[in-house]
Structure formats: structure tokens, C-alpha cells
Amino acid sequence: MRLVGAVTQGSGAINEDGLGYLGNAEDVSAAWIFDGVTGINGQNFLGGGSDAAWLVAKAHDHLKALASLDLPLREILSKLVQTLIADFKTATKDLDLPEDYDPPAACLTIVKRYRETWQALRLGDSCLLARGGDGAHLSVAASPNNAFDHWLSAEALKRRDAGMLDVKELLAEFRPQLMQGRKLRNSPSGYGILEASPSATEFAEYFDLGTPREILLCTDGYFRAVDYYGLHSEQSLLEASLASGGVDSVLDSIHSVEASDPACVKYLRFKPADDATAVALRKRV
């Protein structure tokens, strides 16, 4: 696969997203994206700007070595989680974490070539769109539009109407509900996510991509172009991202919409903007 475009931008001072790939731009053998989960602890404990950014940086560094191994994605994930557990233990050994500490987590999507075919792994709600070798479009894993997110966005809008505009204040108010939702991480009744816990290996999704012609990995901040703002369908997002300068152009269009609706009234959402990341790949010819 050839790297057509890659972009990652934070919505604020700290970008909790991340991306990486193996090989060079003309011959990519694996690629991945991260979407760090916004912390609700009231302060950061682990350095790196935020606890989520710390986890993303550690996981990215480990993946640069692990993704090159001739191992199934399931085993690569297992080794990644083991290293993160060791990292977290070292980082917190002298810290007095609160009893209700919300540990760092991140969405992870990775694709890897195995001889002539490609496999994929997903933890969390980032997106993986692909077009098969026959030209047929395949939405392997799109970002879910879940009921809790809609409820949270609606409640946040009420607070903004009353003059509460700071996201940190909103996070503090809704912390009990967010904590309850995060207790469902990596559980049968919840959702999979990357964290420094053995359970993170149990709830990943795996996909056989066959011999795709094109692949787009993107976080939900980038996929807002589809499910929030209606700028694209899944197929047109894939096509636009694969154009020359496409990922930057798509991100510019997202920023334009967000700048025109800072109070989140026209497009209901919890935060005015989100970190956004995308990697676009096309089969070499």
C-alpha cells in the first residue's frame, strides 16, 4: 500500500490522537491510529500533557516495534497490553491515585499486511473504511452514534444556553454519568478500548480485509464529516480523503463547520471541536 495522506490535529493545546505506519510512503506494511479518551479526573497524573496523551505516546512507541513482528494481530495486541501494564505500574508506583481514578484509555485501529492480504483490529469507535479489489465499497467499521452521546450532547447544550461554556466544567458536572459508562469498558455489556489492563485483549474486533484497493483509518473527530455534519457519505469520505491533499481538505471543511457553530446548536455535540486523525492508503500499481 502507498501512503496517500496522513493528518492528526488536536482541538486544543494537547492532541490526544496519534498515528503511525511501518515502511515508507511508497510501501506501507502496517498503519494505525489512536484516539485518546478525554480524562475526567480533574488533573493529570502521568505527564505528557494528559494521561490519555501519555498512553497514546507509550502505545505508539511500542507498536513501532510490535507491528513489524510476524505475528497475528491478536498476539501483537497481547504484547502491547503487557507493555502498557508495565509502563503504567512504573509510572504510578510513587503516586497516590484517588480511589475513583479514571485510568487512561484510547481507541486503536490498526491494519497490517500478511503476505498478499490485509488484516485489521479495532478497539473503540474509530473508523475503518475500505474499497475492495473489485471496486466495491466496504464499510468495515464505522463510528457508532450511540444514545448516551446524544443525551450528553443535549444536556450540554442546556448548560451552554445557561452560560456554561467551559468543557472542563461540563466534564466535572457529568463525571458521575461518564464514570458509570466507563465502568463498562472491556466488559460483555460494554465496549472494547485500549488500556493498561488484561481485559483490553478480550474485546477487540478483527477483520479480514482480503486484498483491498484503498483503506481509510480515521478517528471519530474526522468521521464527524459524515455522522455529525453531513459533509460526506462514507463512500465520498473515502474518495475525498484519497484525493491529492484530501485528508487536509476534509479536515479544513470540518473546522469550517465547527467554527461556524461554536455553541453546538446547529450540530448537537458535547464539545465544539474534537481531535481528528486520518490515514489514507491506496494499493500500489
Located regions from the model:
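PP2C/PPM-type serine/threonine phosphatase catalytic domain
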Residues: 1-285
